Curated annotation (Swiss-Prot):
Name recorded for this polypeptide: 3-methyl-2-oxobutanoate hydroxymethyltransferase
Pfam families: Pantoate_transf
Active site residues per record: E181 (proton acceptor)
The organism of origin for this protein: Listeria monocytogenes serotype 4a (strain HCC23)
Reaction equations catalysed: 3-methyl-2-oxobutanoate + (6R)-5,10-methylene-5,6,7,8-tetrahydrofolate + H2O = 2-dehydropantoate + (6S)-5,6,7,8-tetrahydrofolate
Gene, per the UniProt record: panB
Function: Catalyzes the reversible reaction in which hydroxymethyl group from 5,10-methylenetetrahydrofolate is transferred onto alpha-ketoisovalerate to form ketopantoate.
Record text on cofactor binding: Binds 1 Mg(2+) ion per subunit.
Names of required cofactors: Mg(2+)
Keyword Signal listed: no
The family this protein is said to belong to: Belongs to the PanB family.
Binding site for Mg(2+): D43, D82, E114
């Protein structure tokens, strides 16, 4: 299993880092078999798996439950778990307690926090306490309720400079990596070159030190709306839906199960059960 020191070396050597967001045992198993470097258990599971319209309703118990499943499916892969909405916006002590609960109960190797500002101090204190932290800048889904959209961030010079300053701040606080989401690729390149820690991009161009996409987006599974930055490497929905429809049709027509799908008893045992005629 790769560790933070390995990710630093990969950045130094120009080797791209691969991260995939997964939420359960079978998807994590697939990801580990594909030899991805990291798994993110994102609070996006609220929308992708649980059917919410945002990440806000996701709880720590949700994150722990899904991370435990991911760990069982990918025991040899570095796992990062999102701290959900409002679990790191209280006191430092509350933040440390919540991070400890997630790491101890789920087995995650690191936690991810969105934003900067007051979050920078939380990253520093978590790092001091021995909890590895991945930062997240740019589009931060937990803040969409305030910003009102999922649009590209940091397009103006002022916003770009603010993001650069925040990236340097979370690095100084001890973050082991930064997710850069939905920012101009030129800015992502500058940030990546300015930092000694790895940058993991999603909608941030190819110049970041690594990339992350959601498992479901990669395989084309259950996605009703596809973001511009997503590339689907398969279209699983195109095979799933007809397969399920065929099953329903065959059961209704009593053509499934066939004899080959059924178990039988020896004729002699049947006679013993029902009596001999």
């Amino acid at each position: 299993m790769k560790k933070p020191v390995d990710f630093f070396a990969m950045k130094e050597n120009g080797e791209k880092i691969t991260m995939i967001t997964a939420y359960d045992y079978p998807s994590a198993k697939n990801v580990e078999q594909a030899e991805a470097d990291m798994i993110l258990v994102g609070d996006s599971l609220g929308m992708v798996v649980l059917g919410y319209d945002s990440t806000v309703p996701v709880t720590m118990d949700d994150m722990i439950h899904h991370t435990k499943a991911v760990k069982r499916g990918a025991p040899d892969t570095f796992v990062v778990t999102d701290m959900p909405f409002m679990t790191y916006h209280g006191s430092v002590d509350e933040t440390i307690q919540n991070a400890r609960k997630i790491i101890q109960e789920s087995g995650a190797h690191a936690v991810k926090l969105e934003g900067a500002g007051e979050v920078v101090n939380k990253i520093a204190r978590l790092t001091e306490a021995g909890a590895p932290v991945v930062a997240h800048l740019g589009l931060t889904p937990q803040s969409v309720g305030l910003t009102g959209s999922y649009k590209v961030r940091a397009k103006s010079a002022q916003e770009a400079q603010e993001l650069m300053d925040n990236a340097l701040a979370v690095e100084a606080a001890g973050a082991i990596a930064i997710v850069l989401e939905a920012i101009p690729r030129q800015l992502a390149e500058k940030v990546s070159k300015a930092l000694s820690i790895p940058t993991i991009g999603i909608g941030a161009g190819v110049e970041t030190d690594g990339q992350v996409l959601v498992y479901h987006d990669i395989i084309g599974y259950g996605i009703s709306r596809r973001a511009k930055f997503v590339k689907a490497y398969a279209e699983i929905d195109e095979t799933i839906e007809p397969a399920l429809a065929s099953y329903v049709k065959e059961v209704k027509a009593a053509t499934f199960p066939e004899v080959k799908h059924s178990f039988t008893m020896a004729e002699e045992d049947l006679k013993g059960l029902y009596g001999r005629e």
